């Protein structure tokens, strides 16, 4: 049985969206058990599942504006902290939260703990491409500064994930840069490039540019945390902007525009789904001793369900243990 500790109080629509996503996951997956951490009375309002689920009550939670490290240290009974401790103590196999991203990263670093020989765990997510296959990118902001050695480790981690969780036999690894030529980039990118070229275990395809990411140029894209987070926000903003422009054009375009939208309804719905990567799951703090997964703060029940499905696959493929063995040299 795969045991998942869930912070029921994190996120914009908690606990309703969290619990409703859990209900659906428990209905569809008979091999998971969920521990819900949070306000028992509020959780029970939405919990319909009766088997393989338990509630661990706490009145304390971490708010979105709390300073991450201080919150983890001072709010020892917060729902997120208790969920992370359950993983550390072996009572759960993975932790899921839609709450404060920085606090969850801190919980991953300081409570769950790093895998031996991994210097800086990275935040990784699967982002959308026009062909619907997506690509994995890390680091998306777990670290403000990185070395070339960190980025090399991210390439190995991302390749492991793409192989074991997404089923890609030979993931194409690209280094995010300001040009595709091998001579491009600052000293960090140039040093990283040399490390990736020298690692024969990687299917390294060279430098990739941000404009090509959504065309599926690579299966795994490596970046420092600052750049990766900026690209993530740009993709999110572009997706929202496109949908907003379409909506404005349709609503303000008169009868002909509305009729055209009606004819294109299925295509527009498909476009919206393609740009909405919540179906794929959450962002993984990769490089810690167990799956620590952050779903978007605005996640609905469907996104929570998708993230639980993602965690289930990670546990099923034992990707974290395989990563630990790889980096420990066993």
Swiss-Prot record:
Q: Where are the transmembrane segments?
A: none
Q: Which UniProt keywords apply?
A: Cytoplasm, Lipid biosynthesis, Lipid metabolism, Phospholipid biosynthesis, Phospholipid metabolism, Transferase
User: What EC number(s) does this enzyme carry?
Assistant: 2.3.1.274
Similarity field = Belongs to the PlsX family.
Q: How does it assemble?
A: Homodimer. Probably interacts with PlsY.
User: What job does this protein perform?
Assistant: Catalyzes the reversible formation of acyl-phosphate (acyl-PO(4)) from acyl-[acyl-carrier-protein] (acyl-ACP). This enzyme utilizes acyl-ACP as fatty acyl donor, but not acyl-CoA.
Protein name per the record: Phosphate acyltransferase
- Identify the taxonomic lineage of the organism of origin: Bacteria, Bacillati, Bacillota, Bacilli, Lactobacillales
């Amino acid at each position: 049985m795969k045991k998942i500790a869930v912070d029921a109080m994190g996120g914009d629509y908690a606990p309703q969206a969290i619990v409703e996503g859990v209900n659906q996951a428990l209905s569809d997956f008979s091999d998971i058990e969920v521990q819900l951490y949070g306000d028992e009375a509020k959780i029970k309002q939405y919990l319909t599942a009766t088997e393989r689920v338990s509630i661990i009550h706490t009145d304390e939670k971490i708010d979105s504006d709390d300073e991450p490290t201080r919150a983890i240290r001072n709010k020892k009974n917060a729902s997120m902290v208790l969920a992370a401790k359950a993983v550390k103590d072996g009572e759960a196999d993975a932790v899921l939260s839609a709450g404060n991203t920085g606090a969850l990263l801190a919980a991953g670093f300081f409570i769950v703990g790093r895998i031996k020989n991994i210097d800086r765990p990275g935040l990784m997510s699967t982002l959308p491409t026009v062909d619907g296959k997506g690509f994995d990118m890390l680091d998306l902001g777990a670290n403000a500064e990185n070395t070339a050695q960190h980025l090399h480790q991210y390439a190995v981690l991302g390749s492991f994930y793409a192989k074991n969780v997404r089923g890609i036999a030979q993931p194409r690894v690209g280094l995010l840069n300001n040009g595709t030529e091998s001579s491009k980039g600052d000293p960090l990118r140039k040093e990283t490039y040399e490390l990736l070229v020298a690692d024969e275990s990687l299917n390294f395809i060279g430098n990739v540019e941000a404009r090509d990411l959504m065309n599926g140029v690579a299966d795994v894209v490596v970046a420092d945390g600052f750049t990766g987070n900026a690209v993530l926000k740009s993709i999110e903003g572009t997706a929202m902007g496109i949908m907003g422009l379409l909506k404005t054009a349709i609503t303000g375009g008169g009868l002909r525009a509305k009729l055209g939208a009606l004819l294109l309804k299925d295509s527009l719905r498909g476009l919206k789904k393609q740009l909405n990567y919540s179906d794929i799951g959450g962002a993984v703090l990769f490089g810690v001793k167990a799956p620590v997964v952050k779903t978007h703060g605005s996640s609905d029940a469907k996104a929570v369900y998708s993230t639980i499905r993602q965690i289930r696959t990670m546990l099923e493929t034992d990707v974290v243990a395989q990563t630990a063995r790889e980096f420990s040299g066993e």
